[in-house]
Amino acid sequence: MLKLSDIKVGDILIADNIDGSEYKVLEAERREDACYFYIENLKTRVRSSLRIRDGNEARSGIAKIVHA
């Protein structure tokens, strides 16, 4: 399972879904309540935010990480 502490700006996140969308991490902020990421879909160039609150593991549909 992916640890949130492993995610850095510039990393590529690969979603755990049918098309395996790839997202580049543009910003990363860690707070006590959650981790917040600003990401960009590399195929569509759509930018969105991602908040993960479940302890220190990413359980938001992202399967693996590829370091840039």
Segments and roles (model prediction):
Residues 21-30:
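Short beta-strand-centered aromatic/proline hotspots
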